[in-house]
Amino acid sequence: SDVYALKKEDELISIAVILHIDRKTLELKNIVTKENYRNKGYAKTLLKSLCGNYKQKYDRMLVGTTENNIPFYVKQGFDKYEKTIKNFFIDNYKEEIKDGELTCTDLIYYSKDLKKK
């Protein structure tokens, strides 16, 4: 795995974790931005940089997300639906996982073609 951080004047703003699946595929395992910096484009900037860095060696990047975050990833080019793992968050976590006000249940995978312009 690779871990990336976006800082602003020595303050950690966003962090991302990339898992190498095979010789041509990566998975964005997590990307998170500090609460007081959200909705200001930091995650978008970090993700764009990661895609740019990896496109020379890899063909596609996967992301598993919740329904609430799909619009963000589609705007970033993750436009191909791959699969849904039903009840992922219920089956794999003892405590309820929330995304804002929504309770997370399914893990939904999308992919981005890193070679596409």
Question: Predicted segments — roles?
Answer:
Residues D91-D99:
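Low-complexity, intrinsically disordered Gly/Pro/Thr-rich segments
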Residues K7-E9, K112-D113:
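Active-site beta-strand termini and strand-to-loop segments that position acidic
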Residues A5, E11-H20, T25-V32:
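Conserved beta-strand in the GNAT
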Residues E67-N92:
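Conserved active-site alpha-helix within GNAT-family acetyltransferase domains
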Residues S1-V3, T103-Y110:
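Short hydrophobic/aromatic beta-strand or adjacent loop that forms the aromatic wall/cage
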Residues Y37-S49:
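Conserved acetyl-CoA pyrophosphate-binding loop and the N-cap/start of the following alpha-helix
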Residues Y54-E67:
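Conserved GNAT acetyl-CoA-binding A-motif
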